[in-house]
Swiss-Prot record:
Identification of the protein by name: Dihydroxy-acid dehydratase
Modification N6-carboxylysine occurs at: K121
Cofactor note: Binds 1 [2Fe-2S] cluster per subunit. This cluster acts as a Lewis acid cofactor.
GO CC terms of this entry: cytosol
Length: 557
């Protein structure tokens, strides 16, 4: 066993003595040592219940004949960090999480790992670590939150609250109505109830094969989560016995399938960023062109909030992720069904008995929302290395208009609230990319303000930053190269005409190459917004969004 490094031989007597101080007995040294990587954090509603959840995981690991050791990672709640400097720490926290898990697990030579993530950057951070460490691993997340209901009976979620702010600002609802939405938008523990980033990544974790069937959709408050925990411990023991590791599971074909599910469900645009980062950790050469190819062959079968009033509890009721995958598998060439997963079985075996129980929630191949996926990769002179749009969250397929430019999210939000943006405009928020932000902050507050003011179908928003999974409308993010790297978005001037063509996958500015070259020669890179601390270091090391915004190791040669 890998853990023999710290527990076997006469020279490991000091190690065993220390381990006995934690409560271990002599008989425990013949069992696998399992890292329980938890993320219990009281300020994050999706993680508040994970302290008790972790205890259940440890009990299940002991029952399976292994020895659990629990530790915690950090985390950032994107909703609470939204709209202020705290959001700059969200994406960088993914790297800290990955590094901290690597540190604890490799320093102590664990034989296997169970990861307990749930929200925002915590799931992808742990997934990156699992691929980097490459020991047998199973993920079991905390589960989605239930949707809420206002006193009037309206179904609401976190995106409803953000959009309520814009609606109140524009006089569409009263302060009492906003308070009603606020009080009922997040009614329980769990990851926010729509197809936002947390739930998108937990669903992708399931199809990648790192988590068990049901992981993405069973609610946090559902007793079936406890059964999932027991199964996770039992399956981990099998993975250890068969020496099946994350890099055996997360192949190019698995990533294809993850993006295929993402396209079928119209998941968060953040999944592109995180899954590209996973490919980097797995040593795979996977780029945005391959994502676009997946998008072209996968129909859009589900619309989940913010694209509709359906939530994760409805997906679960309708058959869960397995039912979606089973329906997708009917179309030849969409999924790779014979690859291994954390169950110890193939994807084909995992979904064999699944079925759609509500075809209003999960559409059939014969009745898709669209013939192509709910996420699309756009390219053009404004995004030579690519950009991402959640096409499933807008009915608009082509938009052209003059740009209104803001050099930060704060500047943009103030401008939107002051009425500087009107119908037909293209809002540009730049210098908010991985390096320029730094940290590539999410733009939920501006998109929600636009939607709340009733302009969601009449105003486009383009940025080198990111969007929350709760964003909707004509929102194009991840524009690469970013402004801080001298990308075309940095060269735009007020009133330039920008064209977004979702059908043709184009993102263009109606300015000649000669004029753009002239502007590039005159452009000067702004001073970094942050020069010290973690964000200062991050800005110096982070790469572009089109490669997952991973950190690069400095070359000292």
């Amino acid at each position: 066993m890998r853990s023999d490094m710290i527990k076997k031989g006469f020279d490991k007597a000091p190690h065993r003595s220390l381990l006995k101080a934690t409560g271990l007995k002599d008989e425990d040294f013949d069992k696998p040592f399992i890292a329980i990587c938890n993320s219990f954090i009281e300020i994050i509603p999706g993680h508040k219940h994970l302290n008790e959840f972790g205890k259940l995981v440890k009990e299940a690991v002991r029952a399976a004949g292994m020895v659990p050791f629990e530790f915690n990672t950090i985390g950032v709640d994107d909703g609470i960090a939204m709209g202020h400097i705290g959001m700059r720490y969200s994406l960088p926290s993914r790297e800290i999480i990955a590094d901290s898990v690597e540190t604890v697990v490799n320093a102590h030579w664990f034989d296997g790992m169970i990861c307990i993530p749930n929200c925002d950057k915590i799931t992808p951070g742990m997934m990156m670590a699992a691929l980097r460490i490459n020991i047998p691993t199973v993920f079991v997340s905390g589960g989605p939150m239930a949707a809420g209901k206002t006193s009037k009976g309206d179904v609401v979620d976190l995106s409803s609250v953000f959009e309520g702010v814009g609606a109140y600002q524009s006089g569409k609802i009263s302060e009492e109505e906003l308070k009603d939405i606020e009080d009922h938008g997040c009614p329980s523990c769990g990851s926010c109830s729509g197809m936002f980033t947390a739930n998108s990544m937990n669903c992708l974790c399931e199809v990648l094969g790192l988590a068990l069937p049901g992981n993405g959709s069973i609610l946090a408050i559902d007793p079936r989560r406890e059964e999932l925990i027991k199964q996770a411990a039992e399956k981990l023991k099998i993975l250890i016995e068969r020496d099946i590791k994350p890099r055996d599971i997360v192949t190019e074909e698995a990533i294809d399938d993850a993006f295929a599910l993402d396209m079928a469900m119209g998941g968060s645009t953040n999944t592109v960023l995180h899954t590209l980062a996973l490919a980097q950790e797995a040593g795979l050469d996977y780029d945005m062109n391959r994502i676009d190819a997946v998008s072209r062959r996968v129909p859009h079968l589900c619309k989940v909030s913010p694209a509709s009033n359906w939530h994760m509890e409805d997906i679960d009721r309708a058959g869960g992720i397995s039912a979606i995958l089973k329906e997708m598998s009917r179309k030849e060439g969409v999924l790779h069904l014979d690859r291994i997963t954390a169950t110890g079985q193939t994807l084909r075996e995992n979904i064999a008995h699944a079925e759609i129980k509500d075809k209003e929630v999960i559409h059939s191949l014969e009745n898709p929302h669209s013939e192509e996926g709910g996420l699309r990769i756009l390219k053009g002179n404004l995004a030579k290395d690519g950009a991402v749009i959640k096409s499933g969250a807008t009915e608009v397929i082509r938009f052209e208009g003059p740009c209104v430019i803001f050099n930060s999210q704060d500047e943009a939000l103030a401008g939107i609230m002051l009425g500087k943006v009107k119908k037909g405009d293209v809002v540009i928020i730049r210098y908010e990319g991985p390096r320029g932000g730094p940290g590539m902050p999410e733009m939920l507050a501006p998109t929600s303000a636009i939607a709340g003011m009733g302009l969601g179908a009449d105003v486009a928003l383009l940025t080198d930053g990111r969007f929350s999974g709760a964003s909707r409308g004509i929102s194009v993010g991840h524009i690469s190269p970013e402004a801080a790297a001298g990308g075309t978005i940095a060269l735009l001037e007020q009133g330039d005409i920008v064209c977004i063509d979702v059908e043709e996958r184009l993102l263009e500015v109606r300015v000649s190459d000669e004029e753009l070259d002239k502007r590039k020669k005159e452009w000067k890179r702004p001073e970094p917004k942050v020069k010290t601390g973690w964000l200062g270091r991050y800005a110096q090391m982070v790469t572009s969004a089109n490669t997952g915004a991973v950190l690069k190791i400095p070359n000292f040669d």
